[in-house]
Amino acid sequence: MSKIPCVAKPQAVLFDAYGTLFDVYSVAQLAEELFPGHGQALSLLWRDKQIEYTRLVTTCNHGAHYQPFNVLTRAALIYAIKKIAINPDETLSTGQFLVDFEPEIELLLAQYQHLDAFPENLPVLQQLKAQGIPIGILSNGDAGMLNATVQSAGFNSLLDHVISVDPVRKFKTHPEAYALGEKTLGLKASDMLFVSSNAWDALGATWYGFTTLWVNRYHLPFEELGTQPTRIGSDLRAVLDFFPS
């Protein structure tokens, strides 16, 4: 964890969902079963394209092309399958592609609602709950996806809020997405801790005004844009350092 001066104890904690609480790459095993030799690459490209699509529909033409996260997730998966798992010499119409690969698409999308939670998450959430700290999710995911994944992980009783950006039709890192945290909890961003394993998300939340923790699970450098998160940790247990007993 980074050596950072002490900060005031946050009044609440908001977590990103995908990559932070839930392992988006846990779909790789099923992807490998469906597309032998391509599972890991497919899961990586799927995630990258998913994030790219959220940025495209948020920034282009003032959000006129917005689509919910589940729609973009499906579109990103189709792209990844076409690029990685299909012979480049094979030409398929969109209709024929869906006929040929609809079962695999649906299986992977269903798995996305049952992503593995990182092993330290449950005890961390339980400790925060025991201290009476309001905790929630602020995610690009739409409500249906989030609720299914939260239920699958057994986190329902531990979370006070599950906030989707869908009502504002803008994905993070748009300020209106982060503002939902303030609106929902009735607190200023500076009084809350925002936790994300996605560096771009931790950066966006820092710019917005949150106290931030970047969960650097993969030991990567932070974004080179002149701003650092409040603290950096290697897993979710670093959250507890903001709340010394």
Question: How would you describe each model-predicted region?
Answer:
Residues 29-30, 45, 75-79, 107, ...:
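Alpha-helical elements of Rossmann-like donor-binding domains used by nucleotide-donor carbohydrate transfer enzymes
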Residues 40, 53-106:
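A metal-dependent, Asp-based hydrolase signature
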Residues 27, 42, 104, 155-158:
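Hydrophobic side chains within well-formed alpha-helices
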Residues 35-39, 83-97, 130, 154-158, ...:
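Short helix-capping segments at alpha-helix termini
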Residues 1-13, 126, 138-245:
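Asp-based, Mg2+/Mn2+-dependent phosphohydrolase catalytic module
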Residues 31, 46-50, 73, 81, ...:
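Hydrophobic alpha-helical core bundles mediating ligand binding, dimerization, or RNAP-core interactions
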Residues 70-74, 90-137, 147, 175:
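Short, acidic loop-to-helix structural element flanking the phosphoryl-transfer center
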Residues 2-51:
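Active-site neighborhood of HAD-like aspartate-dependent phosphohydrolases
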